[in-house]
Curated annotation (Swiss-Prot):
MF annotations from Gene Ontology: heme binding; iron ion binding; monooxygenase activity; oxidoreductase activity, acting on paired donors, with incorporation or reduction of molecular oxygen
UniProt keyword list: Heme, Iron, Membrane, Metal-binding, Monooxygenase, Oxidoreductase, Transmembrane, Transmembrane helix
Name of the protein in its database record: Probable cytochrome P450 517A4
Organism: Dictyostelium discoideum
Pfam short name (any one): p450
Domain of life: Eukaryota
Length: 483
């Protein structure tokens, strides 16, 4: 009986200690948050509100308003900060203390990043080297001609669907478009926009995005650490599918590379990391850099273009404005090219407005290398920080009439708006300009050839579904040829 009493006392003591640890402020400016329960932390509130169909990003948004834009949340043993206070975000833009990724702190991200490698998850000099290599390669190997040719191939692949009056399901076709362009840049390999490989990669990336967006007990409790690899090998199967493709390309490039004539990103990376002197660790870094590019180049582009098409269908009057602008810009040309972009600012603004309201969620996590005061808030070392881009985008102090879909807000130079579509600061996506060009070509050529309509004449469901980015439900539309 005494042993039972002692065990009961120790359990109660642990619960009290854990409760105090999670709720006690360690600094007068420590961020506040909802009551964190022992062991589970704020998982209790997340699961409770899910019963009432309130999604995680909605709940965090509500807390953001209550706690002045910086929400402290304990997910199991991990301390998270969700930041939508733009004054605090500005510190993240310019301060090197916030350049670091917490990939070794969250097991799911650790697995997806090969233990903190790549351009997304590495830090310090390794990250700077990776980013520099990718940025330079993008400038050399991403040509206007390549993007324009792939956009034409994408549009031409829809001819059969239109002629047969079939329903067009954008997501799969956009995945093919994005993968096809990426394969040429990354591996100098021609891949049809309709190829099975494109769909396989697109589905794998979507699988990874979806599963990384939801933290599991394995992410939040150290006690499960012996089972991390076993669990995430099964949960994140999409990672292994993409990695196998990249590894095969790496081996093939080593056999055929001419250092004096690099063909693509893989060649550039092999040369950068020493070619014949490449170690196993270098190979892992090269492959992870390529893996990291698949995410935004395929996943983010697909999600965003999918949203843009949905918004164009739901707003036929704005679709007509975009079409008339494009038609005027191209004149007698059969297809839209990047030379037309300067005369088609509205469609670029439409893409940015869609990203503002629909596709930007929490982005990728970062962490503080050291404790730091950021304005009215104390940011502790090793806290896992997510910038809540969706909440920032709906802040009336930053965006006038923030909840209104209004692309023209990006056309008025007297009213500058924050450029947060691809992250902030030095950690912003190095391929963001290529991504905009890719989406511009795909969407504008689609509009030039077809009027986009919902299947039944009613608005398409635009409910947001939480992921690494915020995605729309799968939907189909009608393609009506323009005369």
């Amino acid at each position: 009986m005494e042993i039972v009493n002692v065990l009961l006392f120790l359990i109660i003591l642990f619960l009290v200690k854990d409760f105090v640890k999670k709720n006690k402020k360690i600094h007068t400016k420590s961020p506040s948050g909802p009551i964190a329960f022992p062991i589970l932390g704020n998982v209790v509130q997340i699961r409770f509100w899910e019963l009432f169909k309130i999604q995680e990003h909605e709940l965090i948004g509500n807390y953001s308003k209550k706690y002045n834009g910086v929400v402290r949340a304990w997910i199991g043993e991990r301390l998270f900060l969700f930041v939508s206070n733009y004054d605090v975000v500005k510190y993240f833009q310019k301060d090197e203390n916030f350049l670091y990724r917490p990939s070794l702190l969250v097991p799911g991200w650790r697995y997806a990043s090969s233990n903190g490698l790549g351009v997304m998850s590495s830090s310090d000099d390794e990250w700077k080297r990776a980013k520099s290599s990718v940025s330079q390669s993008l400038r050399v190997h991403t040509s206007k001609k390549l993007m324009e040719e792939k956009a034409i191939e994408f549009i031409d692949s829809l001819e059969k669907i239109s002629n047969n009056n079939e329903i067009f399901y954008p997501k799969g076709h956009i995945q093919g478009y994005a993968c096809s362009m990426l394969f040429k840049y990354m591996f100098n390999q021609d891949l049809s926009v309709e190829s099975g490989m494109s769909r396989t990669i697109g589905n794998a990336v979507e699988h990874v995005f979806g599963n990384l967006s939801k933290l599991t007990a394995f992410d939040c409790f150290e006690i499960f650490s012996p089972l991390y690899d076993w669990f995430f090998t099964r949960r994140l199967k999409g990672c292994d599918i993409v990695r196998q493709i990249i590894s095969s390309q790496n081996e093939n490039h080593l056999k055929s590379i001419d250092p004096s004539k690099p063909r693509d990103l893989m060649d550039d990376l092999l040369i950068e990391y020493g070619l014949n002197e490449i170690t196993k660790e270098d190979t892992m870094q090269i492959n992870q850099i390529c893996f990291d590019i698949f995410g935004p180049a395929v996943g983010t582009v697909t999600i965003t273009m999918n949203w843009v098409i949905l918004q164009l269908c739901n707003r036929p009057e704005l679709q007509e404005i975009a079409y008339q602008e494009i038609k005027k810009a191209v004149k007698d040309d059969e297809y839209v090219n990047l030379n037309h972009k300067q005369n088609a600012p509205y469609i670029v603004a439409f893409i940015k407005e869609t990203m503002r309201l629909c596709s930007n969620g929490f982005g990728l996590p970062r962490t503080a290398k050291n404790d730091q005061i950021c304005g009215d808030f104390f940011i502790p070392k090793d806290a896992i920080i997510f910038i809540n881009y969706l909440e920032i985008s709906q802040n009336e102090e930053i965006f006038k009439n923030a909840k209104e879909f209004n692309p023209t807000r990006y056309l008025d130079e007297s009213l500058p708006v924050p450029n947060i579509h691809f992250g902030v600061g030095q950690r912003a996506c190095p391929g963001r300009f290529v991504a905009i060009d890719k989406m511009f070509l795909g969407i504008s050529n689609l509009l030039l050839k077809y009027k986009l309509k919902s299947q039944n004449g009613e608005k398409i469901d635009d409910t947001i579904h939480f992921s690494v980015s915020l995605k729309a439900k799968d939907y189909g539309i009608k393609l009506e040829k323009r005369i």
